[in-house]
Regions:
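Terminal, compositionally biased segments used for targeting/anchoring and flexible tails
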Residues: 1-86
Length: 86
């Protein structure tokens, strides 16, 4: 899996803007989704922030599947990880 271009990392943030991590590839994004505060995961999932970045790194199918997810506070982490690992 390829790294994104320098400066194009996915910046994982809390809703108040605090940065909680950065990912330069899908594996790092997956690790952030696993370990980041749920509030940050929901912020990005509800804001549909994952799909554009996935498209940029060439993961078109994953981007499409993530955009189609119904965001549920209790299952969002598992649903996102399932898409990224399929």
């Amino acid at each position: 899996m390829a790294d994104c271009p320098p400066g194009k990392e996915f910046v994982f943030k809390m809703p108040d803007g605090r940065v909680v991590g950065r990912a330069k590839n899908v594996a790092e994004l997956s690790n952030l989704i696993k370990g980041a505060p749920l509030e940050a995961v929901l912020y990005h999932a509800k804001g549909k922030h994952f799909a554009p970045w996935l498209m940029m790194v060439g993961e078109r199918a994953a981007a499409s599947r993530i955009n189609a997810l119904a965001i549920n506070d209790k299952t969002v982490r598992v649903a996102l990880l399932r898409v990224l690992h399929s």
